[in-house]
């Protein structure tokens, strides 16, 4: 990607600023999402604001970073965004409920089952910004995090935050 982007005329600084690439210890420009399936983060207005990448094959075993997200930038702040919000906002308002899951593939799986009022905060750290965004559409949030210890802890913490916000 870095090589193709440079051939198209993109400058190194732009590729670094947008988070598509990073520099390794030798100063080489490296593709941030190499070997990963890419999921675009589409903001509430319908514009791509960032990307997430996930290793899906056998290389997942032992990989330190199974998931890689865009770094914070002028247009992307992970704690301000919700994966799938643009596609889900009408269904959330119509159903007066939103399901909050952990990851991109959870959102996609639920959509495949016909459940469209679902978003992900891409991990377990629910933020006040994300709660306020959802509150524009509904006061009814159901947390559907994974059943591991991190998911259970996040669901308890998230429930406390939601109750503090009157939801």
Named regions from a protein language model:
Residues 1-141, 154-155:
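Phosphate-handling DNA/RNA-contact segment within nucleic-acid enzymes
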Residues 133, 160-167:
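Arginine/glycine-rich "motif VI" loop of SF2 helicases in the C-terminal RecA-like domain
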Residues 147-163:
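Phosphate/diphosphate-binding loops
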